[in-house]
Amino acid sequence: MTLKPIRLRPEAELEIEEAFDYYLRESPRIAGRFLDEIASSLKKIQRDPQLYPAYTKNTRRRILGSFPFSVIYQEREEIILIVAIAHAKRREGYWTKRLKQ
């Protein structure tokens, strides 16, 4: 089975960086755990994109276990597009405009 490549929208990359920087100020260990959980989530999504429930706007969502974030993604023909790394406290659907770009 060939795995589809993962592509992150620039905004999703920025969300990871901002969260990492926040956790790094709190604790380098927590920041490392955050990155580990993101990496693990991306691997799980890549192995089985259909594993996580349908969300909105033709997306799926994987909720992180230890952090208040969700990975919002679309499975496309050639790739898996990571649309957002959405904090639970942000306005729901703030990322939908990214789907049109």
Predicted features along the sequence, with ranges:
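Short, hydrophobic secondary-structure boundary micro-motifs
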Residues: 32-33, 53-55, 94
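Arg/Lys-rich, positively charged N-terminal/basic patches that mediate binding to nucleic acids
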Residues: 1-35
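Enriched for short, Lys/Arg-rich terminal
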Residues: 1, 70, 74-101
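Basic/aromatic recognition patch in beta-strand/loop cores that engages polyanionic ligands
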Residues: 40, 47-80
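Short amphipathic alpha-helical/adjacent loop interface patches that line ligand
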Residues: 16, 20, 35-38, 42, ...
